[in-house]
Amino acid sequence: MNRLQCVCAAAVLVALPALCLSLPARAQEQYQFESDLLAKRQLFRDVAAGFREIHRGPNGNYYVLTAPAPAVMIYDPSGKRIGQVPSASAAAVKGAALVYGQSFDVDHDGRVVVCDRGAKALKIYSPRGDLAATITMPAPVSVVFLPGDEFAVASPDTDHLVTAYDLEGKIVRDYGDREEIADRADVNTQVNFGHLVADEMGNNYFSFDYLPEPTVRKFDRVGYLALEISLKTLEFAPAAQAARKAIARMGESERIVPSLHRIISAVGVDPRTQELWIAIGTLLMRFDKDGQRLSSFRTYLPYGARLEPSQILVEPDRLLIGADPQGIYEFPKPEKLPH
């Protein structure tokens, strides 16, 4: 075995069918290659510091959230700003404007749902940009739309990782087991911070921001666990061990304020193929729909500086990768594996 083969290790895949019956873990083939991925250009140049998320909505328009900002901005495919949510007139209504948006999503009809951390609420807007409903929630972190006029929310203060609501704000189900790895409740709360992405079939993917072993769980549209990718091999072991030692030190004294190191920076999913893209710092990994690692890259800006993604939007022919404060960049979407 050559030295390059020894350096890279494969992820351990744990797959569960819809009824959550455990299957034997399947080790992936050893991964041997890591390539540079260079951004082509910067998009939406007025978006930089405070960037949170970008999503594609109806008519090919792009919706962009920055914080703090009173609204989600809408751009046409050419990059021209054409509107906002809430609309300028609707924003005058009490409680309609955003205080500090953390996450959002837009559906095929143009409805928008926002995790407004500053208002401690979820806000649902109509396609016209009017505030349709507000759901009080102490710490909404991430949100995605699901089929059937539902949306899923991740919040570390709930009993499960994900809670699904209808458009009227009624809870329809919750799912996803929390990770309890510390003696202190406040540390476990931070460990269960996570972000959601979803594909066209309604599968939703929860990525743990702070769990020492990089972990992403795939749930089907009704909440059954379908797949777990947990990276526990030599490539990731030193960072995981350091994170667990830091958590153990926090357990020694209640006076230590929990401050964990972010593990997974961003996750994106191809809405059609269900390929998953996971970023850990500047390392960007591509997985097929079964959780097999296909390729690895290091992300760079056009002038050569490294970029640590905070969001990945997967499109048919490109990747849109955003970061705070650098902004949003277009990256090529490699079609062939490195040789």
Across the structure, where does each feature detected by a protein language model lie?
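Boundary at the C-terminal end of the N-terminal hydrophobic targeting segment
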Residues: 20-27
